[in-house]
């Protein structure tokens, strides 16, 4: 049996743990730079606030309904996630952390009753130890566990956060009530294909011939069909899958037209992306830089410029990556235009252990030692204690986060004081 554990409205729940007066109130969490809504409490969902809603467009709705607004505090959310996952790992050894708020479990050697009991114990313990509410779906396959979790979350008064698809009747009922677009692994393109032949529910999908599914949705689609039929084709992934590309992008608080300001932004993004690259012990050999206008302007005032270039050598050095990124920026920059967003994407990733030395390598060992020293200082004293020359030395541009909560669990001077 497989279980899918999902933290309910995770970001909003994290804020409520340390501010219990928020219970029952609508909450929205905003993206980087306080741009768009990326998470909502159930109360906010009930107000019709959609995911991705531009914050400025919903300002009056927020005010009228007394919506509590928070800037995204990923330091807090990441730490709370680690605590939740640590608790879960005490119950079952076979754990796959799927995302910041989701994990799969495999119950090998458990009877059905034992697995049910263990799931309910996890819900109770996570709530008691962290204050985070979780829902669990249990089923014979990972794909069905996802659907079982959906049932558990949709009917909390009946399920109390736990639902098990443990027989054929429950499986068929759940598949009959879920649309193809809501099935994990279907995707937008496949949903369109299925809709074109009047396949709109999970039941419709599993009734398709295997040959059609394999031909039109590849072997991956066929595996999904088998999963929904109750035959496991996906197992717990215990090894960490490294990212195939790394991006750092931001919208600006106000439009930027100066090349100097854009260089500072791209350099800072390069430093952040390079650090992510080193954290997963990878190197890149391709870089894409883009700049674009405000998407809410008139059509004739919208523009997007991007350029991708190949490095002469693989690297994870902030110095080399930022230098190359700035060169790309200068090629796409246009005067007399204003820009609202910029970003850098690192591609062509490979393990740093596979590095092949070439004539183009520039004191590679010296740069590795330098990057290691910078990372050590950053980890100990915070980001940007050591900066590149093209980063602003008087101030480092920071995201607009006017509604940021405290780092209750990671900063000693921000912990709650009990009087």
Spans of model-derived segments:
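Short Gly/Ser/Thr- and Asp/Glu-enriched loop/turn motifs at secondary-structure junctions
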Residues: 98-102, 139-142, 282-286, 337-341
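Short clusters of hydrophobic/aromatic residues that line enzyme substrate/ligand-binding pockets
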Residues: 162-165, 180, 246, 252, ...
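DNA-contacting surface of Y-family translesion DNA polymerases
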Residues: 182, 192-338
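Gly/Gly-Pro- and Ser/Thr-rich, intrinsically disordered tail segments characteristic of DNA damage-repair
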Residues: 1-226, 364-419
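Short, charged/polar surface micro-motifs in flexible loops or helix N-caps
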Residues: 10, 33-35, 294-297, 349-353
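C-terminal hydrophobic structural anchor segments
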Residues: 323-380
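Short, charged/polar, Gly/Pro-enriched secondary-structure boundary elements
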Residues: 112-115, 298, 350-357
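Short, hydrophobic beta-strand segments
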Residues: 104-108, 306-312, 354-358
């Amino acid at each position: 049996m497989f279980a899918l554990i999902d933290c309910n409205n995770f970001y909003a729940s994290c804020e409520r743990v340390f501010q219990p007066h928020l219970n029952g109130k609508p909450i929205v969490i905003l993206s980087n730079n306080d741009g768009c809504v990326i998470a909502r409490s159930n109360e906010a969902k009930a107000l019709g606030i959609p995911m991705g809603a531009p914050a400025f467009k919903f300002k009056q709705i927020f005010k009228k309904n007394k919506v509590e607004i928070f800037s995204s505090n990923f330091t807090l959310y990441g730490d709370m996630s680690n605590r939740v996952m640590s608790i879960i790992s005490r119950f079952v050894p076979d754990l796959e952390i799927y995302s910041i708020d989701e994990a799969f479990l495999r119950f090998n050697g458990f009877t059905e009753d034992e697995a049910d009991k263990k799931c309910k114990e996890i819900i109770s313990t996570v709530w008691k130890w962290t204050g985070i509410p979780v829902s669990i779906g249990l089923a014979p396959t990972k794909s069905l566990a996802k659907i079982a979790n959906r049932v558990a979350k949709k009917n909390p008064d009946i399920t109390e956060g736990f639902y098990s698809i443990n027989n054929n009747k429950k499986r068929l009922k759940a598949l009959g009530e879920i649309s193809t677009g809501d099935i994990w692994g279907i995707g937008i393109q496949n949903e369109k294909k299925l809709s074109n032949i009047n396949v709109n529910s999970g039941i419709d999908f599993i009734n398709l011939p295997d040959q059609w599914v394999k031909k039109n949705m590849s072997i991956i689609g066929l595996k999904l069909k088998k999963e929904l039929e109750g035959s496991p084709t996906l197992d717990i992934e215990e090894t960490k899958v490294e990212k195939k590309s790394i991006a750092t992008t931001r919208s600006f608080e106000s439009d930027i037209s100066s090349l100097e300001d854009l260089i500072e932004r791209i350099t800072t993004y390069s430093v952040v992306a390079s650090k992510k690259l080193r954290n997963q012990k990878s190197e890149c050999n391709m870089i894409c830089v883009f700049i674009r206008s405000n998407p809410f302007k008139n059509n004739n005032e919208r523009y997007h410029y991007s350029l991708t270039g190949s490095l002469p050598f693989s690297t994870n050095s902030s110095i080399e990556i930022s230098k190359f990124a700035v060169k790309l920026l200068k090629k796409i920059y246009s005067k007399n235009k204003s820009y609202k967003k910029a970003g850098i994407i690192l591609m062509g990733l490979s393990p740093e252990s596979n590095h092949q030395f070439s004539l183009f390598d520039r004191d590679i060992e010296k740069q590795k030692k330098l990057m290691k020293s910078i990372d050590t200082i950053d980890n100990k004293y915070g980001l940007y204690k050591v900066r590149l020359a093209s980063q602003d030395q008087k101030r480092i541009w920071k995201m607009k986060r006017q509604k940021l909560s405290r780092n209750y669990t990671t900063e000693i001077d921000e912990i709650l004081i009990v009087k």
